[in-house]
Amino acid sequence: MSAKEIKFGQDARSLILSGVNQLADAVKVTLGPKGRNVVIDRSFGAPLITKDGVSVAKEIELEEKFENMGAQLVKEVASKTSDVAGDGTTTATVLAQGIYREGVKLVTAGHNPMEIKRGIDKAVEAAVAYLQELSKPIKDHKEIAQVGTISANSDKTIGDIIAEAMEKVGKEGVITVEEAKAMETSLETVEGMQFDRGYLSPYFVTDAERMEAVMEDAMILIHDKKISNMRDMINILEAVAKQGRPLLIIAEDIEGEALATLVVNRLRGTLNVAAVKAPGFGDRRKAMLEDIAILTGGKVISEEVGFKLENATIDMLGNAKRIVIDKENSTIIDGAGSEVDIQGRVKQIRAQIEETKSDYDREKLQERLAKLVGGVAVVKVGAATETEMKEKKARVEDALHATRAAVEEGIVPGGGVALIRCIKAIESLDLPGEQNWGVNIVKRAMEEPLRQISANAGAEGSIVVNQVRGGADTYGFNAAADEYCDMIEAGIIDPTKVVRSALQNASSVAGLMLTTEACIAELPKEEAGGGMPGGMPGGMPGGMGGMGGMM
């Protein structure tokens, strides 16, 4: 085990503070509408240009071990806030720096750090309770667009696209972000349930121009095994032909005689039919087939539950208003499943999402959920260069997370104003002894985001803070326009969840750093190769002589 270096008390705290300051100072230049960019060198490709706090924080590693501890702890604040709320990483970093910096001064002056931490915790608890009071539920499309715009660094186009996507697929719908081939950022939506399996034969196509098989008021046969023998399907096909309605067959595979017969019937016009493979693999395939069955009001014809294909009847088939199948995807629109069954299935999938530990499984479950309740929207991000595309895509993802957070917990005035309003809630706290110092630290730290937004906009932070503190609840400083106004009316709003997470995560880590009395790190290793150049010339001739003797 290698030797360790230990630092105690003030020595340890001042080194941690130095690390915290280096990381926070690099991150906080990005805060607010007039925040600056940070350029990050990478070992491959072009440098990354970003205004995203967490991207800057993740790149920082300091050479000095004890300083690096401070930087890594604040990086944890930014990452956790990003994971929980999707935005607010820079605010969280600025708050953590403010709480720790003020706290270190008091601990150095001889105050008890444990009591200070208790005071910080109680102050944050009171502030969070006041935030919930201040919070208003999101009302309309316009407010969703405003939240998206603020999170995307005041890019109105992104805000509008995200609001439109949420309107189209609902609050539960899946919205994904992809890189576009063109310069423009656009939105594509898929209504109904879409899965990534196309027609098994181009002879099923009904619209030759678009190479699509389109079926109106269709029936759906869902089977979990391969179909290769036509005899198994004769009964059900005859029953469907009598109804005179189109039929979609979804099975593990359809091949040989069965596929050939379906194609011949389709070409002769005897039966309007199309066949696709079942989506997914293994257990996920079974679950997706069950989803399709519930959505369309049909049953999965499976021997596992006692249904054989040759005994299938019309009432086992699903129904849908419209089905569109192209070479790669099938879309079922307006299935005839009962609302009660669909909601039951949705509840079941939500429970699985809560329980699963795997990110991949969670993503797949969320996709299934979206297909049942709303649909899927894809935001295609376009830009002139790859560097701009990456930066823009990160902003779109931030904006998307923030709008989801706003829908979840509501909104508060933005621009650091909500935290300023929480100060009066914690001023009324009456705590014993040194805990009051903890309250004072939080009061001072809550001004920091507004100070930094003002400083980045070229204004004097202290003057702005005083002016805003004297105003009404929603009164604040619009840094983009350099004026004081009603923040809600100006569309400068933050999701409550983002502000809450930033404050809680910052105080949690800063409080732990304050109560640190010793730090341990590995000693830097001595370079072992110092004596080698001198040793080699002396060693080699002897060795060579030995070899000569052997020969």
Curated annotation (Swiss-Prot):
UniProt cross-references to Pfam families, sorted A to Z: Cpn60_TCP1
Entry keyword annotation includes Calcium: no
Binding annotation for ATP: 30-33, 51, 87-91, 415, 478-480, 494
Keyword field: ATP-binding, Chaperone, Cytoplasm, Isomerase, Nucleotide-binding
GO molecular function ontology, one term from the record: unfolded protein binding
GO BP terms: protein refolding
Gene3D superfamilies referenced in this protein's UniProt entry, alphabetically: GroEL, GroEL-like equatorial domain, TCP-1-like chaperonin intermediate domain
Record-stated family: Belongs to the chaperonin (HSP60) family.
Quaternary structure (record): Forms a cylinder of 14 subunits composed of two heptameric rings stacked back-to-back. Interacts with the co-chaperonin GroES.
Protein purpose: Together with its co-chaperonin GroES, plays an essential role in assisting protein folding. The GroEL-GroES system forms a nano-cage that allows encapsulation of the non-native substrate proteins and provides a physical environment optimized to promote and accelerate protein folding.
HAMAP family associated with the record: CH60
Entry protein name: Chaperonin GroEL
Gene name tied to this protein: groEL
